[in-house]
Design a protein with these regions (language model features):
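Catalytic cores of NTP-dependent nucleotidyl/adenyl transfer enzymes across multiple folds
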Residues: 114-169
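Conserved catalytic core of two-metal-ion nucleotidyltransferases
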Residues: 80-114
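Active-site nucleotide-donor binding segment shared across nucleotidyl transfer reactions
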Residues: 27-66
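Short, flexible turn/loop "capping" segments at secondary-structure junctions
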Residues: 1-4, 49-53, 116
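Helical scaffold of the NTase/Pol beta-like nucleotidyltransferase catalytic core
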Residues: 1-40, 161, 168
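Short amphipathic alpha-helices in soluble, non-transmembrane regions
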Residues: 70-78
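Short loop/hinge segments at the start of secondary-structure elements
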Residues: 66-68, 83-84
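Short histidine-centered catalytic/ligand-binding loop motif
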Residues: 8-15, 60, 121-125
Length: 169
């Protein structure tokens, strides 16, 4: 029998951009200076007015794909947890716990690659469309109220994103 993982939702928290900037500063403090990275706040916590799980998503875009492993290893050496489940050969996913709770999810990808552009453009397009924010919020709230599993919640979100953001430039 599969254990049903639950999830919590929060209204937009104005401290999330500050939390992102602080975490970005921490990450930059230990990454080798020779590695060219672009670190951006992604996901619903980057969109004012969006309901989201209270976990800040961060994309680290690496200019040279050969540096993906170095960045991953640097994060690991500084307490970030590698997720083999969400990772692939060109997209590493890591988490950071604060007070025992995952507060940050880090996506290490090729800068300006397809995945990086999808994540960055999702935020950009959502920020500029209040009716779409409402529709996305309604979906998440409905799933939460129906006590959907975290797996089903994630699946429904990905489907919504695919339907509404099929063109990534």
């Amino acid at each position: 029998m599969e254990v049903k993982k639950s999830f919590s939702l929060s209204n937009y928290n104005p401290s999330w951009p500050t939390d992102f900037r602080q975490e970005r500063k921490i990450i930059l403090s230990f990454l080798p200076k020779i590695i060219d990275v672009h670190i951006v706040h992604i996901g619903s916590t980057a969109v004012e007015g969006a309901v989201s799980r209270p976990i800040i998503d961060i994309a680290i875009g690496v200019m040279n794909p050969l540096d993906l492993i170095t960045v991953r290893d640097s994060l690991s050496a500084n307490g970030y947890l590698f997720s083999s489940k969400g990772s692939s050969i060109n997209h590493f996913v890591m988490g950071k716990r604060v007070d025992g709770i995952i507060k940050f999810i880090i996506h290490i990808v090729k800068y300006n690659g397809i995945v990086y552009r999808q994540m960055a453009n999702f935020v950009k397009k959502l920020k500029n469309n209040y009716s779409l924010i409402k529709e996305y919020n309604d979906l998440k709230i409905r799933l939460h109220n129906e006590k959907a599993s975290l797996k089903e919640y994630s699946h429904q979100k990905r489907y919504f994103e695919k339907v509404h953001f099929t063109k990534y430039s």
